[in-house]
């Protein structure tokens, strides 16, 4: 049995690679500095040994292959040992391509926003239609309770991330995936720590599109200008578009999009009734329906499957309710995602109740201040705004507070920020916490303080 050792195993992607390798029959071990649930628990349940930190003893005797996570940098003791001793190494995306994806019909879900949700939807649609596909998702799939599976059908569904592959391969991860069905949800400027501008991101998408066969399919939105520009660089595959007067269209039946109609070539085909809200999620669902249709799933059957779809955690996830005040958690950390999430919540709760938006500017792009001027407008649907000033932020959140049209508050101390939120909160309020990190456990802190109010 060949031994694979993974550096940086506890990230969602690398943890998923580990689970798939284990299911393929490899002996899998790994290491990380951040060994914590849920990923550590999932891996241990699979019988995968996790070694804390990067002592080089973990590479003695040498494994057959070292898979290097994209968080690994030169100077890491294990990275230096691998290079010095000429151990065989590769990246996660390259390993997936060489050992798994080249033999499968790959359905890749790409785009700046909505990847995890759409990948989960597509996986569930195929599952409910008897196609037990493999999958690798950048979050814990709500219907499956795991983020990755080998699967036993020809299909493999993968969340196609534009972030770079490894310290030795600065191409986007998705360049390795060679999809036959590609969803391009949207292309916006993000990851300013590795991309200079939007054109640099579009170039990576173009490189992926160049690898799709002529019989393959690219799905994108007719209204998505950045995607159109990218496709104009060259596309040798079939293309289908979402939007009125295009192949695929969805129309809300209820304001919050928990019930919507699906149109194909202008004809209404089916309806979706589900426990998810937001026009952005209706759009995500339409992408999943169209991609599933490419594999032969009937539109009506895809719509029926979505009725029992459970979203990944951290997508407008209710964390608790105290004194008729509801606290939500959401992964939104880009102005476009913040606006979409707030719009979805506003459509759900209506205009007669208050939404308190709580934001931690934590992502690398946020820290650099790239989207600083877009944050206040994105928060426009909230009745009040609360922001944390992280130590490592290069700009002042007070500037955003001053730009907000609604009351806006900030603090550099998490506990003081919690006190400010709780002091302003009233029964029937909806408190929406947005961050791509744990935000210091602020959700539970708010709920605990509300109980004492």
Curated annotation (Swiss-Prot):
Residues binding ATP: 111-117
Pathway: Cell wall biogenesis; peptidoglycan recycling
Catalytic activity of the protein: UDP-N-acetyl-alpha-D-muramate + L-alanyl-gamma-D-glutamyl-meso-2,6-diaminopimelate + ATP = UDP-N-acetyl-alpha-D-muramoyl-L-alanyl-gamma-D-glutamyl-meso-2,6-diaminopimelate + ADP + phosphate + H(+)
GO molecular function terms noted in the UniProt entry: ATP binding; UDP-N-acetylmuramate-L-alanyl-gamma-D-glutamyl-meso-2,6-diaminoheptanedioate ligase activity
Gene3D superfamilies the record matches: Mur ligase, C-terminal domain, Mur-like, catalytic domain, NAD(P)-binding Rossmann-like Domain
This enzyme's EC code(s): 6.3.2.45
Keyword Cell wall biogenesis/degradation assigned: yes
Coiled coil: none
Keyword entries, A-Z: ATP-binding, Cell cycle, Cell division, Cell shape, Cell wall biogenesis/degradation, Ligase, Magnesium, Nucleotide-binding, Peptidoglycan synthesis
GO biological process: cell division; cell wall organization; peptidoglycan biosynthetic process; peptidoglycan turnover; regulation of cell shape
InterPro entries: Mpl (IPR005757), Mur-like_cat_sf (IPR036565), Mur_ligase_C (IPR004101), Mur_ligase_C_dom_sf (IPR036615), Mur_ligase_cen (IPR013221), Mur_ligase_N (IPR000713), MurCDEF_pg_biosynth (IPR050061)
Enzyme class of the recorded protein, top EC level: ligase
Cofactor: Mg(2+)
Family assignment from sequence similarity: Belongs to the MurCDEF family. Mpl subfamily.
NCBIfam families: mpl
Matching HAMAP family: Mpl
Function: Reutilizes the intact tripeptide L-alanyl-gamma-D-glutamyl-meso-diaminopimelate by linking it to UDP-N-acetylmuramate.
Protein name per its UniProtKB record: UDP-N-acetylmuramate--L-alanyl-gamma-D-glutamyl-meso-2,6-diaminoheptandioate ligase
Organism of origin: Haemophilus influenzae (strain ATCC 51907 / DSM 11121 / KW20 / Rd)
Lineage of origin: Bacteria, Pseudomonadati, Pseudomonadota, Gammaproteobacteria, Pasteurellales
């Amino acid at each position: 049995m060949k031994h694979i050792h993974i550096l940086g195993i506890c990230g969602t992607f690398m943890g998923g690679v580990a689970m798939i390798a284990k299911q393929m029959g490899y002996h899998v071990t790994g290491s990380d500095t951040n060994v914590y649930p849920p990923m550590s628990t999932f891996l241990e349940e699979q019988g995968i040994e996790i070694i804390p930190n990067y002592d080089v003893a973990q590479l003695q005797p040498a494994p057959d292959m070292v898979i290097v996570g994209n968080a690994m940098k030169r100077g890491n003791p294990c990275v230096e040992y691998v290079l010095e001793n000429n151990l065989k190494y590769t990246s996660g995306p390259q390993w997936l391509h060489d050992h798994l994806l080249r033999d499968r019909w790959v359905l890749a879900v790409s785009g700046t926003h909505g990847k995890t949700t759409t990948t989960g939807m597509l996986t569930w649609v195929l599952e409910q239609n008897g196609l037990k596909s493999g999958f690798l998702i950048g979050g814990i799939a709500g219907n499956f309770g795991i983020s990755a599976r080998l699967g036993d059908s020809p299909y493999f569904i993968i969340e196609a991330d534009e972030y770079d592959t490894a310290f030795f391969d600065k191409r986007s991860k998705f360049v390795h995936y060679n999809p036959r069905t590609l969803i391009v949800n949207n292309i916006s400027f993000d990851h300013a720590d590795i991309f200079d501008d939007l054109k640099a991101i579009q170039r990576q998408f173009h490189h992926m599109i160049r690898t799709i066969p002529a019989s393959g399919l690219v799905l994108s939105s007719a209204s998505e200008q950045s995607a159109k520009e990218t496709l104009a660089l060259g596309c040798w595959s079939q293309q289908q578009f979402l939007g009125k007067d295009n192949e695929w269209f969805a129309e809300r039946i209820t304001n919050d999009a928990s019930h919507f109609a699906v149109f194909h070539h202008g004809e209404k085909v089916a309806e979706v009734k589900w426990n998810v809200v937001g026009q952005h999620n209706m759009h995500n669902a339409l992408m999943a329906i169209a991609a599933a249709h490419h594999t032969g799933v009937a539109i009506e059957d895809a719509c029926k499957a979505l009725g029992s779809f459970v979203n990944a955690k951290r997508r407008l996830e209710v964390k608790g309710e105290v004194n008729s005040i509801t606290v939500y958690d959401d992964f939104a950390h880009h102005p476009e995602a913040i606006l979409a999430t707030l719009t979805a919540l506003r459509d759900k709760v209506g205009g007669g109740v208050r939404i308190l938006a709580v934001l931690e500017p934590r992502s690398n792009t946020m820290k650099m201040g790239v989207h600083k001027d877009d944050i206040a407008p994105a928060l426009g649907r909230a009745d009040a705004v609360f922001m944390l000033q992280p130590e490592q932020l290069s700009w002042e959140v007070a500037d955003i507070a001053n730009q907000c049209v609604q009351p806006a508050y900030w603090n550099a101390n998490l506990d003081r920020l919690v006190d400010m939120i709780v002091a302003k909160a009233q029964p029937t309020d909806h408190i929406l916490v947005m961050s791509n990190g744990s935000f210091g456990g602020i959700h539970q802190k708010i709920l605990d303080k509300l109980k004492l109010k």
